[in-house]
Amino acid sequence: MPTLLLGAAIPFGTIAYTLFIFLILLVMLRKFAWGPLMGIMKEREEHVTNEIDAAERSNAEAKKLVEEQREMLKQSRVEAQELIERAKKQAVDQKDVIVAAAKEEAESIKASAVQEIQREKEQAIAALQEQVASLSVQIASKVIEKELKEEDQVKLIRDYIKEVGEAR
């Protein structure tokens, strides 16, 4: 005899059979479909988590590398600036050395020229004294030839040369 379920004419046996089949299907789905499906989902979740972690590590490493590169660039700029400053200082020092050497050489040339001028002046004065003495002797010998002896003439000339030498 069929029982009615909520006023519908569905036999109880069919309902029990359908419920039994449904329960078997649920058990089979749980064992063969849900288990592996949940395992795959779990693996996928772990894979995605691992990928996210790897991406975060890569991102952190990239940020670290960028920071290191910035620091290296900053350090390179500082070193370049120091190198430029050292080169400028070296150039100034070298300029000072060259200028000092040039001044020293100029002073040496000037001193040498002054000595040369002094020597030539002394030579010119000596030559002039000799010429004056020679001319004086000639003039004096003509003028005084009759009045002075030769010894007196020589003494007179020597005195005259001394006077000319002291006058300079």
Swiss-Prot record:
TM region(s), chain numbering: 9-29
Give the membrane topology. Answer: Single-pass membrane protein
Which is a Pfam family this sequence falls into? ATP-synt_B
Supply one GO molecular-function term.
proton-transporting ATPase activity, rotational mechanism
Which locations, inside or outside the cell, does it occupy? Cell membrane
Keyword Membrane among UniProt keywords:
yes
Main localization (coarse): membrane
Record flagged with keyword Signal: no
Question: Any idea what job this protein has?
Answer: F(1)F(0) ATP synthase produces ATP from ADP in the presence of a proton or sodium gradient. F-type ATPases consist of two structural domains, F(1) containing the extramembraneous catalytic core and F(0) containing the membrane proton channel, linked together by a central stalk and a peripheral stalk. During catalysis, ATP synthesis in the catalytic domain of F(1) is coupled via a rotary mechanism of the central stalk subunits to proton translocation.
| Stated name of the protein | ATP synthase subunit b
Species lineage, top-down?
A: Bacteria, Bacillati, Bacillota, Bacilli, Bacillales
